């Protein structure tokens, strides 16, 4: 990629945002060296890798990458024999611990069923160095001090030091507490000078204590003297400290040699953890932007759905759909300056650069991107003072370079093409330059304010005009991209809104050719038509989504209902069988007892009486079990099905009406308010409803059958309520009721709305209304039946 392209598209600013999500200098180094790739397979793998990390972030919210350091230089020094400091060794141990934790973290997620093949491959390369890690942390404390436990010798030496220090302090404190000391000492304290314990003695009492003078105060009135009585003790203390230093250095050197022995493994682990830090930084950045993984294709087209510029506040940015490479390979965005054309241009460029860098991009899911070998951008004022080039010349130097290199694998972005010179000549140059790159097969997005290019897309294949919508009421751009609609200046409308008189505006219109006016009016109508079409499409799309959601929910509820019904039937059947089995066992026991009594001649019981008793006991078996054992074969001839027939859908156990045959073996069936495809093999014919023969209808019910004039649903769950409404309306129609009432209460209104939505689609409902004041008001729906 050209450095200039990366600069004008602000690629480095994206990297600066990405840097904020790294956990270590290792990851930061990777980000700083990040560049877009041009290899298709590599880009696909990078996108998949970022997607796996994003999945981990969704599952866990974070990745345990704390405590990771760039220890590469320390490890290399250890290899050549340099002794590492305690803090350097602690950094190595901390990084080894972090690597081990990261490995276990990913493996645990995989063990729980997540599919992370790429991350799993990464962490598989991490080699645990637990023993070395523990050896370092066992010898060095969190503050960087070598611990007494590092060796027995060090513990013994430090015990000697503590004993010597205690004896010295004891002697000196005794001296400072004596009555004579009060007048000879500047202060009754024990202090240290040159690593030796001393007391502050007044100048005039210098000879009282003897010993060695190590320092004096700024005034010279106080001498810091090591009394003669502790000189030997101080000497012993110094010797012990020298031994301590030697032992500490020996321990550090020993640990350094341990690190050197595992240097290659440590460095390999560092490289893996650096990659993981970089990968998870990309995932966290994607989460921050609400970015998604684009589909990468090699068909040389892109489809960015609701694309946003990553560097603009998402609260103010207007997302746009941008398609390039399918029906058209060149987009020319026309219209006035400050209309958001450059933002659209930069959005395309930066999204491509990010995608080819393995970053997710700020677009909706299912967006597609292709791989470009070169991305060229001529954006902004690149005037060179040193070369004394004008704005036009500066742009032209860049355009000449682009024309030398652009080919069918290039994306070319032109901002205000042909600007900075005579408008007529600039427009002519712009058209010629666009023709050149377009004919080479490059993908091109260009912006211009020249009116001559408004018709550019109408007489060339695979070229389309576009514009950025402008609201003349607010005198500001909406930043909404209108594909297929060229831009217009809006100068007259803006001037009118700002108070310019109609007389002046009308005279200005007369100076414009009739053709130009026609074009402007045509563009205005196109803009209005496109806005209306988009609004209608959004409304239709929203209704479609709601319908699909309702359809899925109803299907789920029906399936759950039938599963619950079957489960209860099976449970009841099992309980019945258990009771029957218990009765049979009891019968067998009674029969055995009677036979034993007969053998013992204590009872005169005949065999036929035993058989009769057993038959009576078997006759007590519940009907459910008996019916299950009897399989009745349906020998009725198969009914020829027609639209309008009522059938029973066996899978759901529900009654439905045939709507339309959609294949040799499938029908569209209306089950309540739900429409679905059902196979003929899953239906059972019920009847064909007669057409409008209401007078001849007679309903026969059993003596005890009664249908109430009202149905009370208060306290019912929504699903149960809907099933009760369906059955109640069927029963009310069979009873020839002209009107019924459904009591749903007021509450939150959810049940009321559900009931009325159901009534709208019920074929037996003529009309419905809320109840009057005496009927229950909003808590009741009165239904008129057909």
Curated annotation (Swiss-Prot):
Pfam families: MSSS, MutS_V, Smr. The keyword Transcription regulation does not apply. One of its GO terms (biological process) is rescue of stalled ribosome. SUPFAM superfamilies: DNA repair protein MutS, domain III, P-loop containing nucleoside triphosphate hydrolases, SMR domain-like. Disulfide bonds: none annotated. Endonuclease that is involved in the suppression of homologous recombination and thus may have a key role in the control of bacterial genetic diversity. Acts as a ribosome collision sensor, splitting the ribosome into its 2 subunits. Detects stalled/collided 70S ribosomes which it binds and splits by an ATP-hydrolysis driven conformational change. Acts upstream of the ribosome quality control system (RQC), a ribosome-associated complex that mediates the extraction of incompletely synthesized nascent chains from stalled ribosomes and their subsequent degradation. Probably generates substrates for RQC. This is Endonuclease MutS2. It comes from Bacillus cytotoxicus (strain DSM 22905 / CIP 110041 / 391-98 / NVH 391-98). The gene is mutS2.
């Amino acid at each position: 990629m050209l450095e200039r392209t990366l600069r004008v598209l602000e690629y480095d600013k994206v990297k600066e945002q990405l840097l904020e999500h790294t956990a270590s200098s290792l990851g930061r180094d990777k980000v700083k060296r990040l560049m877009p790739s041009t290899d298709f397979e590599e880009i696909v793998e990078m996108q998949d890798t970022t997607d796996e990390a994003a999945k981990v972030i969704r599952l866990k919210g974070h990745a345990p990458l704390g405590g990771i350091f760039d220890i590469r230089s320390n490890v290399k020094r250890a290899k050549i024999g340099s002794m590492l400091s305690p803090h350097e060794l602690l950094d190595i141990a901390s990084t080894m611990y972090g690597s081990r934790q990261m490995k276990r973290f990913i493996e645990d997620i995989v063990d729980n069923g997540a599919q992370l093949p790429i991350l799993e491959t990464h962490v598989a390369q991490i080699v645990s160095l637990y023993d070395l890690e523990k050896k370092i942390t066992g010898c060095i404390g969190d503050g960087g001090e070598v611990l007494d436990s590092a060796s027995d010798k060090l513990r013994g030496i430090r015990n000697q030091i503590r004993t010597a220090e205690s004896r010295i302090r004891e002697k000196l404190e005794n001296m400072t507490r004596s009555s004579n000391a009060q007048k000879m000492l500047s202060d009754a304290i024990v202090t240290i000078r040159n690593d030796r314990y001393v007391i502050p003695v007044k100048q005039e009492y210098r000879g009282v204590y003897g010993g060695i003078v190590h320092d004096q105060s700024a005034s010279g009135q106080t001498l810091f003297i090591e009394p003669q009585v502790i000189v030997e003790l101080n000497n012993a203390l110094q010797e012990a400290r020298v031994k301590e230093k030697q032992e500490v250095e020996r321990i550090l050197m020993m640990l350094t040699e341990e690190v050197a022995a595992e240097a290659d493994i440590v460095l390999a682990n560092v490289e893996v953890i650096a990659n993981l830090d970089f990968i998870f930084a990309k995932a966290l950045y994607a989460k921050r932007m609400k970015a998604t993984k684009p589909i990468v294709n090699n068909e040389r087209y892109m489809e960015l759905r609701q694309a946003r510029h990553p560097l603009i506040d998402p609260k103010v940015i207007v997302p746009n759909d941008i398609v390039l490479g399918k029906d058209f390979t060149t987009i020319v965005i026309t219209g006035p300056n400050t209309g958001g054309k450059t933002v659209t241009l930069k959005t395309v460029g930066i999204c491509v650069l990010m995608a080819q860098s393995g970053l997710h991009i700020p677009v909706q899911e299912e967006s597609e991107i292709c791989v470009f070998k070169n991305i060229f951008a001529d954006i902004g004022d690149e005037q060179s003072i040193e070369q004394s080039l004008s704005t036009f010349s500066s742009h032209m130097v860049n355009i000449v370079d682009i024309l030398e290199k652009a080919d069918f694998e290039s994306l070319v972005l032109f901002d205000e093409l042909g600007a900075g010179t005579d408008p007529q000549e600039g427009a002519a140059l712009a058209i010629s330059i666009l023709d050149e790159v377009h004919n080479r097969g490059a993908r091109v997005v260009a912006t211009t304010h020249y009116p001559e290019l408004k018709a550019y897309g109408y007489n060339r294949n695979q070229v389309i005009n576009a514009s950025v919508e402008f609201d003349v009421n607010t005198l500001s751009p909406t930043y909404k991209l209108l594909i297929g609609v060229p831009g217009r200046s809006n100068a007259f409308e803006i001037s009118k809104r700002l108070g310019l008189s109609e007389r002046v505006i009308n005279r200005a219109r007369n100076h414009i050719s009739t053709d130009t006016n026609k074009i402007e009016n045509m563009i205005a109508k196109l803009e209005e038509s496109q806005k209306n079409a988009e609004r209608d499409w959004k409304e239709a799309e929203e209704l479609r989504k709601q319908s699909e959601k309702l359809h899925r929910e109803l299907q789920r509820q029906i399936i759950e209902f039938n599963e619950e019904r079957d489960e209860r039937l099976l449970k009841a059947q099992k309980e019945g069988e258990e009771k029957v089995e218990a009765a049979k066992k009891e019968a067998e026991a009674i029969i055995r007892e009677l036979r034993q009594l007969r053998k013992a001649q204590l009872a005169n019981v005949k065999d036929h009486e035993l058989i009769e008793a057993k038959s009576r006991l078997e006759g007590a078996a519940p009907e459910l079990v008996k019916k299950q054992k009897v399989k009745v074969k349906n020998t009725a001839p198969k009914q020829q099905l027609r639209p309008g027939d009522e059938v029973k859908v066996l899978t759901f156990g529900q009654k439905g009406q045939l709507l339309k045959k959609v294949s040799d073996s499938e029908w569209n069936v209306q089950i309540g308010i739900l429409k679905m495809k059902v196979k003929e093999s899953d239906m059972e014919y019920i009847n064909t409803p007669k057409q409008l023969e209401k007078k001849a209808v007679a309903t026969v019910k059993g003596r005890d059958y009664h249908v109430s004039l009202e149905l009370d649903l208060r306290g019912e769950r929504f699903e149960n309520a809907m099933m009760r409404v369906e059955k109640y309306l069927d029963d009310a129609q069979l009873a020839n009721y002209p009107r019924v009432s459904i009591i749903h209460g007021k509450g939150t209104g959810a049940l009321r709305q559900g009931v009325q939505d159901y009534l709208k689609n019920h074929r037996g409902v003529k009309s419905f209304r809320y109840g009057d004041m005496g009927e229950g008001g909003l808590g009741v729906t009165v239904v008129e039946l057909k």
